[in-house]
């Protein structure tokens, strides 16, 4: 093995093998030469010359065969050596290592250490990148949380201001509406600059932008109208007695008769022709007529909506109602029947079952009546039972005092004025009619807005771009809506209201009180259940006692009839008494029954 590792190339090894083979052949030849003379001498001594020649030929054949066999063996050895060298080379390629003379594998150890170092470096890089990404993600989440915290604080402040009455969000303009107004103002400023420069292309472009902004503003205005037409807003306006102004200053300053003065000045300044002036005049008159129709419709709708609120939702005392109430002497408990005021009987349709509280009171009254009237005769008992059973039905005298009993036990009086001031139920048809009126009011406002847009588009078709730009600059130069001032006013008002409310004492907390109330309610519920069970048991006992009394009285009546039909003899009376006493043990023994037996003996 050491010879193979010390050799550097395979060629040198092959040369060495060849030299060994050459050395091996002369030795064999010498041995063969030594062997052949000895054999010849031996043959000469034992045999003749003829036999010696034949043996020599055979020996030559054997020698040739042996040489061939030896050559084959040498070739096999060479092949085995080559295979071993190839295996060693493959092992060195697969696992490169530098062997020392002692056989230690220092190369493999260094490779393992290098691999470990590489893996460690890769793991460190991966962990460093992960920590970096984690820090960035946490930082991003913290920033979002900070933004949300600021928004939450702002919303809390706004809610506090709303609770204190500092601002009404329903009246706050939409942010989109504010942006649209600011964009329109910027377009007007750019139109003024383009007019001064006499740039028609920029005028056309800016006018197109202005028309687009008006179309976008339509949807925003519709949302603002929905806020104003909301039932809560209309209820507040009706309660305050607010009546809106029917004349819109924006419309009257453009299409009204009072706007003729500045229109004439504009016609002369913009150099409008006679045909254009006639078309503008006709357009203004048509716009004014349509606006008058919309105003009349809006006035009727507003009046009917406020009447509904003041008659069906928020009923306030008026002179007419007070005069009628004093004239007819009406009150909450004795109002006339709305269907038949002069009738003397209550129909089943107007009577509704009473509340559980009323039934409990009636049951208590029944118990008291039964206990008080227990000592009366059978006829009185039967009449009292009938009266107690019919206590829920009103008598003709009670008809004038009862108008209607609601399902929940509350009184609902419908007086002669046609409305119910307490718990008045509204029909579904009335609610639907009222919603139609609100929808019509919303459409009225939207129609007025579309009328303005249509008038503006008609004017743009009549005028040239420069004339239209001059008109817009003149009209909108005097219009201004400062939203910053509005917000400042709202904030100042909120701070003033907050100072006023801080002077009042804060309301107490009701956490413990609510728990006590809940416990008290549970106790009351348990007590009412127990009372109802006791009342049922007492009613059952009373019914049994009444049945026994009826049977006892019937037996007494039969005895009296027998005594009246038969002649009165002492023996007969004793017999009747004996019969009575023999039949008396069948009655169940109770203090009430024993008390009823004593008068019969007398």
Swiss-Prot record:
From the UniProt record, list the coiled-coil ranges. Answer: 58-94, 509-552
Phenotype caused by lack of the gene: Following starvation, development proceeds normally only until the finger stage, when extremely long and thin fingers/slugs are produced. DimA and dimB double mutant has the same phenotype.
bZIP domain location is 113-176
Q: State the CDD domains in the record.
A: bZIP
Which chain regions cross the lipid bilayer?
none
Quote one Gene Ontology molecular function term: transcription cis-regulatory region binding
Alphabetical list of InterPro entries matching this protein: bZIP, bZIP_sf
Q: Where is this region: Disordered?
A: 1-128, 328-401, 525-602
Q: Give the main localization category.
A: nucleus
**Region Leucine-zipper: start-end pairs:** 138-145
* Polar residues bias locations: 1-10, 593-602
- Cite the entry's keywords alphabetically: Coiled coil, DNA-binding, Nucleus, Transcription, Transcription regulation
GO BP annotation list: cellular response to differentiation-inducing factor 1; establishment of protein localization; negative regulation of gene expression; negative regulation of programmed cell death; positive regulation of gene expression; positive regulation of sorocarp stalk cell differentiation; regulation of gene expression; slug development involved in sorocarp development
Q: What does this protein do?
A: Transcriptional regulator involved in DIF-1 signaling. DIF-1 (Differentiation Inducing Factor-1) is a signal molecule involved in the differentiation of pstO (prestalk-O) cells. May be a direct activator of ecmA.
Q: Which family does it belong to?
A: Belongs to the bZIP family.
The annotated subunit structure for this chain is:
Binds DNA as a dimer. Heterodimerizes with dimA; in vitro. Also able to form homodimer; in vitro.
The protein in question is named Basic-leucine zipper transcription factor B
- List the source organism: Dictyostelium discoideum (Social amoeba)
């Amino acid at each position: 093995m050491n010879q193979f590792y010390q050799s550097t190339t395979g060629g040198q090894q092959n040369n060495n093998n060849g030299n060994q083979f050459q050395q091996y052949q002369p030795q064999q030849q010498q041995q063969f030469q030594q062997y052949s003379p000895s054999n010849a001498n031996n043959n000469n001594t034992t045999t003749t010359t003829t036999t010696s020649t034949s043996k020599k030929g055979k020996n030559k054949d054997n020698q040739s065969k042996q040489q061939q066999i030896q050559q084959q063996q040498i070739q096999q050895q060479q092949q085995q050596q080559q295979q071993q060298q190839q295996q060693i080379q493959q092992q060195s390629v697969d696992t490169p290592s530098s062997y020392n003379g002692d056989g230690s594998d220092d190369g493999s150890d260094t490779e393992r250490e290098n691999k470990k170092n590489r893996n460690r470096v890769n793991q460190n890089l991966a962990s460093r990148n992960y920590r970096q990404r984690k820090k960035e993600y946490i930082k991003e989440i913290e920033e979002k949380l900070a933004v949300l915290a600021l928004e939450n604080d702002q919303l809390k402040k706004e809610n506090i201001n709303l609770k204190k009455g500092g601002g009404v969000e329903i009246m706050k303009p939409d942010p989109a509406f504010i942006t649209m107004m600011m964009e329109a103002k910027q377009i007007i400023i750019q139109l003024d600059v383009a007019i001064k420069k006499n740039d028609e292309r920029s005028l056309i472009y800016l006018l197109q932008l202005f028309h687009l902004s008006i179309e976008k503003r339509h949807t925003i205005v519709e949302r603002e109208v929905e806020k104003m037409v909301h039932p809560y807003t209309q209820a507040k306006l009706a309660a305050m007695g607010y009546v809106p102004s029917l004349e819109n200053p924006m419309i009257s300053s453009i299409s009204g008769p009072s706007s003729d003065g500045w229109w004439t000045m504009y016609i002369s300044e913009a150099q409008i022709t006679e045909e254009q002036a006639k078309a503008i005049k006709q357009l203004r008159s048509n716009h004014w007529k349509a606006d008058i129709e919309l105003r009349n419709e809006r006035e009727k709708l507003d009046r009917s909506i406020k009447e509904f609120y003041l008659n069906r939702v928020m009923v306030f005392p008026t002179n007419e109602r007070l005069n009628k109430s004093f004239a007819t002497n009406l009150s909450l408990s004795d109002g006339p029947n709305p269907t038949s005021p002069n009738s003397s009987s209550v129909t089943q349709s107007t009577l509704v079952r009473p509340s559980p509280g009323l039934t409990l009171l009636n049951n208590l009254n029944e118990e008291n009546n039964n206990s008080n009237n227990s000592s009366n005769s059978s006829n009185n008992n039967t009449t009292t039972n009938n009266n107690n059973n019919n206590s829920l039905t009103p008598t003709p005298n009670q008809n004038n005092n009862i108008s209607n009993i609601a399902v929940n036990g509350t009184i609902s009086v419908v007086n002669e004025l046609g409305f119910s001031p307490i718990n008045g139920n509204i029909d579904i048809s009335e609610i639907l009619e009222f919603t139609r009126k609100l929808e019509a009011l919303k459409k009225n406002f939207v129609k007025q807005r579309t009328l303005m847009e249509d008038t503006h588009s008609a004017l743009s078709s009549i005028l040239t771009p420069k004339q239209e730009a001059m008109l817009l600059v003149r009209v909108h130069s005097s219009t201004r809506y400062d939203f910053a001032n509005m917000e400042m006013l709202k904030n100042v008002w909120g701070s003033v209201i907050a100072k006023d409310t801080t002077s009042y004492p804060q309301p107490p907390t009701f956490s413990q009180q609510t728990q006590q109330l809940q416990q008290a309610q549970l106790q009351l519920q348990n007590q009412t259940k127990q009372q109802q069970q006791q009342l049922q048991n007492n009613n059952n006992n009373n019914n049994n006692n009444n049945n026994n009394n009826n049977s006892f009285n019937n037996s007494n009546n039969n005895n009296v009839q027998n005594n009246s039909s038969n002649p009165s003899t002492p023996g007969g009376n004793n017999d009747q008494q004996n019969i009575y006493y023999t039949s008396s043990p069948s009655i169940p023994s109770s203090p009430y029954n024993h008390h009823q037996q004593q008068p019969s003996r007398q």
